[in-house]
Amino acid sequence: PEVGFDLPQTKALVKKALTEMGYAPQDCGKCGVLALAGGKRPGKTILLRGDMDALPIQEESGEEFASEVPGKMHGCGHDMHTAMMLGAAKLLKEHEDEIEGTVKLEFQPAEEIFQGSLDMLKNGLLENPKVDAAVMFHVLAGMPLPVGTVLVPGGGITMASCEQYHITVHGKGGHGSMPNACIDPITAAAHIHI
């Protein structure tokens, strides 16, 4: 496990695996890696994101798969995310001729310190080709769910950041004959676009 932007072994492993699959991985920002699948047929560009960094914590689980690196552990599952992204890359490469559009694979560093995505965004993550939509995933370590369970939020619900925003719209009541003297919170809330 490696922490933050200091991921030389992880980045090298990802780039080597992608190259062996037939990709031409690209560096993005301080330590991110990008690869493109498809692009031979017209269509949209979908970004598939997975993070790679570990936590600066000494692992004391005693498990046979416990970290052997002092003071660093994958306690949040990003090692699984990296493996899952490489698995997706393999499947996408095997079916590349069937892809309409492009899938941009993003291997993100520094998620745990809330800096990796911003660094990659500032360095062209969403360009060349321009990204139309993004998909991310996260394992739920410690959740009492059956093996193989996938949780998918309802339509329009996303959480690909470390923050949530809660917006409260306050209005001012009045009479329907004088809408100019009122503040309708329902109309205002319906017009908020984030």
What spans do the regions from the language model cover?
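Acidic/His- and Gly-rich active-site-bordering loop/insert found
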Residues: 1-74, 83-100
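Histidine/acidic-residue-rich, glycine-tolerant segments that coordinate divalent metal ions
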Residues: 63-73, 80, 92, 97-194
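Short, glycine/acidic-enriched loop or turn micro-motifs at the edges of active sites
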Residues: 54-56, 78, 141
